[in-house]
């Protein structure tokens, strides 16, 4: 999506400061980073398991790429060295299918977020696909997402949307926003 409206709407909803530390987990070559830079955000980190995807985004951004911190890592194993105000995860969390991976990831998120930070997670819903790019995923409902995160985060809002893929397929996502307690 050239303009990831759902994700950008969260930034507006929470009135995220242009100097806030933002991390995009699984950002790869998505256009969120382009939009963040265009909107004047100054502390952006993009993490993805695929160096090739990050390289594609860097090439697309040209000189602007130097304004972004790029991290090649598996979200399940990532151990940040700084704290974030806004943690964005669109379609990385659902690849964590083992309970131990999910628990480790949630621990990392809560340890790496500033007090009252905002967490956005978008995954395939229980009405969405069971696989992504041929890989098994874990589907979520509002209830199951909240149950995973309620120890450290207060739910602000959840909703489902249909995403149309480039091939024309419809994928149902659930997006939830949380505030760190």
Regions found by a protein language model. Name each.
Residues 1-82, 96-108, 118-181:
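Class I (Rossmann-like) S-adenosyl-L-methionine-dependent methyltransferase catalytic domain
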Residues 111-114:
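Short, conserved loop/helix-junction motifs that constitute active-site signature segments
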Residues 88:
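A conserved beta-strand element that flanks and buttresses the S-adenosyl-L-methionine
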Residues 85:
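Conserved acidic residues
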Residues 91-95:
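Short catalytic micro-motifs in class I SAM-dependent methyltransferases
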């Amino acid at each position: 999506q050239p303009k990831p409206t759902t994700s950008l709407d969260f930034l507006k909803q929470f009135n995220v400061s242009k100097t806030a530390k933002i991390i995009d987990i699984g950002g790869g070559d998505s256009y969120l980073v382009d939009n963040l830079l265009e909107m004047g955000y100054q502390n952006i980190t993009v993490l993805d398991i695929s160096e090739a995807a990050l390289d594609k985004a860097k090439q697309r951004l040209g000189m602007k790429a130097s304004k972004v911190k790029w991290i090649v890592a598996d979200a399940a194993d990532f151990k940040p060295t700084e704290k974030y105000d806004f943690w964005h995860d669109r379609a990385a969390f659902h690849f964590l299918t083992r309970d131990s991976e999910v628990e480790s990831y949630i621990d990392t998120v809560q340890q790496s977020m500033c007090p009252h930070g905002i967490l956005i997670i978008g995954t395939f819903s229980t009405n969405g696909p069971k696989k992504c790019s041929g890989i098994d995923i874990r589907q979520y409902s509002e209830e199951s997402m909240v149950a995973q995160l309620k120890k450290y985060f207060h739910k602000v809002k959840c909703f489902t949307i249909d995403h149309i893929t480039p091939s024309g397929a419809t994928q149902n996502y659930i997006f939830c926003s949380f505030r760190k307690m």
